[in-house]
Amino acid sequence: MIGEILINAEEHSTLHHRFSMGYFHEVNEGGKHTGLFHLVILNFGASIYEKFSANAECPEETVNKMRALSEKYTSRSLFRSGEFEEETLWTLYALQQGVTSVPDMQRGSGTIQFIRSFFNIKGSLDVDNVSRMMLMSGKTEILFDGTYGVQEKIEGNNKFNVMTFNESGNIEDRPDQRFVKTTDTYFPGTIIAAKILLNEDDVKEIN
């Protein structure tokens, strides 16, 4: 899954470059043998929102769905200037399975699968309240700590994964502002930063 994210970071960068860094910190305390894996992946260029809103090559069907979603939020007065703006909504929508800004690309699931893998390693908050992941793009910040997870939705004969950060599991409902928010800081591109606690049962030695 990390490989998929690296590919995505390079493909979706308007400068066609991505950068990554990681390190592992082994910990032996209180009779417990654990480790902390730190990972940062980033690219520079257009933000996720800009890749959809200011990109003539972006699939029209996807952009139309995003605009329709914005209209629903506007009609219900769910946007708040400086707190939760259209940019943040579109960035969250872009994480959903099947959504991509690249024409004729069928994947559109690398990010959501990476998020699911993160949660699979992390486990519940009761077991691991250390692991965290953060995505920042443009003026949007999204925090993953396990409070909200990936959900499976069914439409007709199709199944797909969604991450809505609310109790309803509906992207049309405003996400929890503690985890999805508009910030004062602008990052020209996208950063994914993760801190993952690894226990001995998370890693199997191959002899």
Regions found by a protein language model. Give the residues of each.
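Flexible, glycine-/charge-rich segments associated with ATP-binding catalytic modules
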Residues: 50-207
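Conserved ATP-binding N-box helix of the HATPase_c
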Residues: 1-32, 111-121
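Short beta-strand element(s) in the Bergerat
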Residues: 34-39, 190
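Glycine-rich acidic phosphate-binding loop
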Residues: 42-48
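Residue-level signal for functionally critical sites in structured catalytic/ligand-binding pockets
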Residues: 7, 43, 96-98
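An acidic- and aromatic-residue-enriched active-site/binding cleft used to recognize and process polar
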Residues: 3, 25, 44, 138-140
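Short, solvent-exposed loop/turn segments that connect beta-strands within catalytic domains
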Residues: 28-35, 125-129
